Regions:
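Short helix-capping segments at alpha-helix termini
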Residues: 20, 101, 219-221, 242-247, ...
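Residue-level signal for inorganic ion chemistry
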Residues: 30, 111, 150, 180, ...
């Protein structure tokens, strides 16, 4: 049977026998490009039957990889300083691609934009210009770190955009994802529809503070508490609070509800660690190598924090208050059942742009 998973595993074994570095990542990248499926979603489509044409293109690409040296020397990124900006960008993209970096062109442009202090969309206006040695060396170092070490560009530049705002990030916190904007959107929608005067919100596992700070700025009459067990995360969330002038949010250390005294929140919101320990095979290398494990992985097949927050959370919500979770791939239905068993009403699943259940909401309603 020519299903995706069988062909993928055979391809990985083939490259490993040929001593290709990072065989799994290389293979997944090839499949992603040829099949038009995001690399992280390949395993979700493991039963997909591949056409003879797809298999032929995959074989051709794998053979090409084994017959050429895909490594590019660091010196080859920029040879000399006389080349113009367009040439340097092209070489950087080539280097990142040959080191199996997804979205190589976008990442290269982000790095150039940051170093040159110019909007990424305006880089083309400088294509014919030459860079000085200082900027060239800085860009080279950034490109090498992403290509060689698989170091996330967000950590490299200490910046990630979320909900239209730039947040400071480093390796002490998870990089805010676009998926989490679905959670924030649903929270804003719920709060505005309720028209609660000065809503009280608890953000558990705040990390960089992206969720809580965004809600604080979008709902300016709210009062928000953001908690985390990590001292590093709390330092970063405080930094973002200051950078973005979010005055109506406070951060403090707490293991879930351990240090929380207030028990009439209008909303509890959380994007907790939800990855099971056996799911590392579908995760990107940069995430595994550099993002904090404590922000990624959870016991009980990734469901531990959903159970704990759901169970304990009822004591901290006012009657009529809401609880909102972001969930991992294929977790939404299970989390919905956990919340229903725990006694929440009006439990709903909200899907993201890819039609995947991303957010689960419920309400505390007691007679």
């Amino acid at each position: 049977m020519n299903n995706l998973l069988d062909i993928l595993n055979k391809s990985i074994n083939y490259l490993e026998k040929k001593n290709i570095k990072n065989a799994r990542i290389v293979t997944e990248t090839v499949f992603s490009q040829i099949l038009g499926i995001e690399r992280i979603m390949l395993y979700a489509n493991f039963e997909k039957v591949l056409s003879d044409g797809d298999i032929a293109r995959i074989k051709e690409k794998l053979n090409e990889i084994t017959t050429q040296n895909n490594e590019i020397s660091d010196k080859e990124i920029f040879e000399g300083n006389s080349e113009n900006l367009k040439s340097l960008i092209d070489k950087s993209v080539s280097y990142l691609e040959k080191n199996n970096i997804n979205e190589a062109k976008l990442i290269a442009e982000i790095i150039f934009s940051h170093v040159l202090e110019i909007d990424r969309m305006l880089l083309f206006t400088k294509y014919k210009e030459n860079l000085d040695k200082e900027k060239t060396d800085k860009i080279r170092n950034f490109i090498q770190k992403v290509g060689k070490e698989k170091f996330p560009v967000q950590y490299l530049l200490n910046e990630q955009e979320f909900y239209g705002r730039k947040f400071y990030v480093n390796t002490g916190v998870l990089i805010p994802r676009q998926d989490t904007e679905v959670l924030v959107e649903e929270a804003i929608k719920t709060l505005r529809s309720e028209k609660t005067e000065t809503p009280k919100i608890l953000d558990i596992g705040t990390g960089s503070g992206a969720i809580g700070i965004t809600l604080a700025l979008e709902i300016p009459d709210s009062k928000i508490m953001g908690t985390d067990i990590s001292d590093k995360a709390l330092e970063i969330s405080e930094k973002n609070k200051s950078l973005l002038n979010a005055e109506n949010i406070k951060f403090f250390k707490s293991d879930l509800f351990e240090n929380i005294e207030y028990k009439k929140f209008d909303m509890i919101i959380s994007n907790p660690p939800y990855i099971a320990s056996d799911e590392t095979k579908v995760m990107s290398e940069d995430t595994l190598l550099h993002e904090p494990d404590e922000a990624l992985f959870a016991e009980d097949e990734g469901l531990y924090f959903y159970r704990e927050i759901s169970f304990q959370g009822k004591e901290y919500l006012r009657n009529g208050g809401y609880i909102l979770f972001e969930t991992g791939y294929k977790q939404a239905e299970t989390v919905k059942k956990i919340m229903e068993i725990t006694g929440y009403k009006n439990v709903n699943i909200i899907k993201d742009m890819q039609n995947i259940g991303r957010v689960v909401t419920g309400q505390k309603l007691e007679s």
